Amino acid sequence: MKAAPLDYRYRFALHGMLFFVGFAFYWLPNSHESTWLVLTPWLERSGWFSFSSATISLLILAILCAATAAFLRAWGASYLGSGVVQSRDMNGDLLLADGPYRRTRNPLYFGTFLHAVALALLMSPFGALFTIIAVGLYQLRLIFIEEQFLAAKLGQPYLDYCKRVPRFFPSLMPRVPPSGAKPRWLQAVLGEIYMTGVAISFAVFGWRYNAFLLTKCVLISLGASLILRAVQPHTDKSYQQ
């Protein structure tokens, strides 16, 4: 393990701050409507959607983004280990090329970006724009930090892996053969309970078409994840993140 830059060590807190700022745009004048509510009549005016179908289409988009984010992060964590995912230090003793890492080098960060897109529909338009751009740029920053560390740590095998596997957007087919790691789904799902809770909230409560209710569900999911993180042991073997 290696001590990491501060913006890597405190990445969970910084993500939380970015999402908080995104929601805080509601406090600005003339910014009291959710992006969901603003986009619905805009799509209706395009002539392709009725008001009802536009509302439902945006909800389905949010559900798909939230669910895909939760699945990708849990899938990646099942191979990587929740202890490594949550560690403040840089980890890279072994090259992991299993599960989602056969299709993208950064399934966790891609999942986080999709999660930001889902939450953006609950924010004001300016908050949504800020969040998607800020979270996207922050993912790139974290990726570059990790790539420099892993290239120095693992050498040519990692560079060869990078040539074959996309950095961010997953490929439909695996790009490398499996390395033999086994997934541990229970600890992964528990470690990603926040993402899972948000995805379930969108799927279950989204049909009430209430952005404020969904925002409360996000906060409840966050609280549950903080409690679990405080009590969950971190004894996982070190892989690349």
Language-model features: where?
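Membrane-anchoring alpha-helices and their flanking helix-loop junctions
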Residues: 1-98, 114-241
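Catalytic beta-strand/loop module used to bind and position nucleotide/cofactor moieties
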Residues: 101
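Conserved SAM-binding loop
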Residues: 104-114
